[in-house]
């Protein structure tokens, strides 16, 4: 190994895992060969959690040339581990391509990107400040930028290549860059009781032909990327899992990284490939669109949009996990599974939020009965939510009083809107349901689940209305508004006893 070859991701500790209640860091080899010993990948960052799993899955797919069928996955589950020799052989064969620093082929980077006009490493993570971008959660600036450890830099590199939103670039003949492969979609990651189970739950059957991860193709050079010269079809599972969305060259300072060379990456050509972790919904025009996270609402409210009843397409990882769970139950094997929905909310090039939502994954979620119950439950919740929103507007109108509204957006309308939005009615209702939904979802296939959900809706609405009454006050106009609102609120609760309109 030459002096310029440094920090091999196969052996060096950089992937945080939970073992025996403690977080330790391991390399790719240990993570895969001892996956059964680790509870899970443990990181506060939902984006890191997603990309670390995608990297490990890419290595497994290529090392095992599969799985070719679900039976392969079930066999590895029964045996309690992956075949070790193929994994060791594969990692040894491509060992030189996993150095974070390398004169010719640094991992997921471009070796000849110039050092001039470097950017801070923090640009790799949406939650850290960089240049003129506003901070999301952190107040780091280029003046007080701490060094990233090699492990931090490696994880940040993976996050950026998968999640970088498109936007202005103006480097090396490229004015703007396109979205990284999963910059917009919600990602579905079923998880088991240890890292081995989690990887198996996401190891969707795979055909290795016409696919290659970044370490199996010749290293990219600046000349390949200038002027958006290199374009690849967005196809091939491991190609997409390890996509070089941007040209990056981490600049080693001997004990960490503060700056990097930065430029354009490989431009994606649209293709029919579906990322296994991504679901799709049908829009009003009959087009399939990727399912995204929303800044205003929790993901569960959009769950049914991906189900076949509504013309959507479930993420392949979710379908695979459901099928595997059924097989395990048939054999009397335990398989408690949860579902993690990961991703970011962005507006063009600006990242607004980073999310991880965790739900139980019920057996039989994709059965007709479960789909029907879920669709009805979400429709009930939305109808009551809309009713409460209208109620808040009516209460606000009664408090403000009727006035001449004039033309355009009058002060009256602004006052009315401000008061209605300040009432906690709708906000507290949805907040309560965020906590209630997982309990319903765990039993979604059961006949009684809708009755339980109605009670949850009723309880959430009642508590939200009580809080609204306390919030509004006891002035004469306020009491009159609440008295009028009480009748409307009673009508809304009465409708809960009726069957959902279909």
Curated annotation (Swiss-Prot):
Presence of the UniProt keyword RNA-binding in the record: no
GO BP: any one term: defense response to virus
Keyword match Ribosomal protein: no
Transmembrane region(s): none
Keyword list, A-Z: Antiviral defense, Plasmid
Family to which this protein belongs: Belongs to the CRISPR associated protein CasA/Cse1 family. Type I-E/Ecoli subfamily.
Biological role stated in the UniProt entry: CRISPR (clustered regularly interspaced short palindromic repeat), is an adaptive immune system that provides protection against mobile genetic elements (viruses, transposable elements and conjugative plasmids). CRISPR clusters contain sequences complementary to antecedent mobile elements and target invading nucleic acids. CRISPR clusters are transcribed and processed into CRISPR RNA (crRNA).
Assembly behavior: Monomer. Part of the Cascade ribonucleoprotein complex. Interacts directly with the 5' end of crRNA, CasB, CasD and CasE. Binding of target ssRNA or dsDNA causes a conformational change in the Cascade complex; CasA is required for high affinity target DNA binding. Interacts with Cas3 once Cascade has recognized target DNA.
Protein name according to UniProt: CRISPR-associated protein CasA/Cse1
Name of the coding gene: cse1
